[in-house]
Amino acid sequence: MKRTYQPSKIKRKRTHGFRARMATVGGCKVLARRRAKGRAQLAL
């Protein structure tokens, strides 16, 4: 049986990246929360 986590930089960026976050309302809210908290890194 293969492991569930098969790392891929492209997939990672496309699902969790900044532009992916900005594309949806929920994603924008995530970024807003992280800005309010003062996170150094907002998205991947």
From Swiss-Prot:
Keywords: Ribonucleoprotein, Ribosomal protein. Pfam families: Ribosomal_L34. GO terms for biological process: translation. InterPro entries: Ribosomal_bL34, Ribosomal_bL34_CS. Gene3D superfamilies: 1.10.287.3980. PROSITE patterns: RIBOSOMAL_L34 (PS00784). Coiled coil: none annotated. GO terms for cellular component: ribonucleoprotein complex; ribosome. One of its GO terms (molecular function) is structural constituent of ribosome. Belongs to the bacterial ribosomal protein bL34 family. This is Large ribosomal subunit protein bL34. It comes from Phytoplasma australiense.
